[in-house]
A protein has these predicted regions:
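Short beta-strand and beta-hairpin "edge-sheet" elements
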Residues: 104-149
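Short, acidic/charged, Gly/Pro-enriched secondary-structure junctions
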Residues: 82-116, 120
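Polar, enzyme-active/binding microenvironments
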Residues: 16-21, 109-110, 149-151
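Acidic glycine-/aspartate-rich tracts in secreted/extracellular proteins
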Residues: 76-80, 144
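Short, charged, solvent-exposed linker or helix-capping segments at domain edges/interfaces
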Residues: 83-86, 148-152
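Solvent-exposed edge beta-strands and adjacent loop segments
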Residues: 2-76, 116-133
Length: 152
């Protein structure tokens, strides 16, 4: 019998490389107030290679395209703003030093999913009557490590 997981306790963390080209194994800081994560689909594009001798279309795998932005939904809080601004500042400094910033989607009692990317400045989402104020955190992905043992 399979034991399914739920989303209680899922978190988004980040850490900048201390050594260029090496994903950090520890020292990740948590981004608070996350409400939703994006789907990260690692399905490669398909390139058609059919020729006139084929009765059916044929394809080969092409470039993997995970999209141009991973968008995380969060409740807008002072703690979120502070944490996100720290992440953006550290990522900018890391990039200027030719180092990457890594993100970890941490699932309790399971592995984590890792990717490197560039976080963008915090904007303002639309607002309406009788609603919580949310924010969308945008991260431009530039490397996917995938599933691995969670950070310490």
């Amino acid at each position: 019998m399979a034991l399914e997981f739920n989303t209680i306790g899922v978190s988004l963390k980040w850490a900048s490389e201390t050594t260029a080209g090496s994903r950090p194994l520890s020292g990740y800081a948590t981004i608070p107030s996350i409400k939703g994560t994006p789907a990260i689909d690692i399905n490669p594009n398909k390139i058609e290679v059919t020729d006139l001798s084929d009765a059916y279309r044929r394809y080969v795998d092409g470039v993997k395209d995970v999209g141009d932005s991973f968008d995380f939904t969060a409740n807008l809080t002072a703690a979120l703003k502070t944490a996100w601004n720290s992440c953006v500042s550290a990522a900018t400094a890391a990039r200027n030093a030719s180092k990457a910033t890594w993100f970890e989607i941490n699932i309790p009692n399971f592995d984590s999913f890792f990717f490197a990317g560039l976080p963008t400045e915090l904007g303002v989402n639309e607002m309406g009557v009788d609603a919580v104020i949310e924010s969308t955190l945008h991260i431009v992905p530039n490397q996917i490590a995938g599933w691995a043992t969670k950070s310490t």
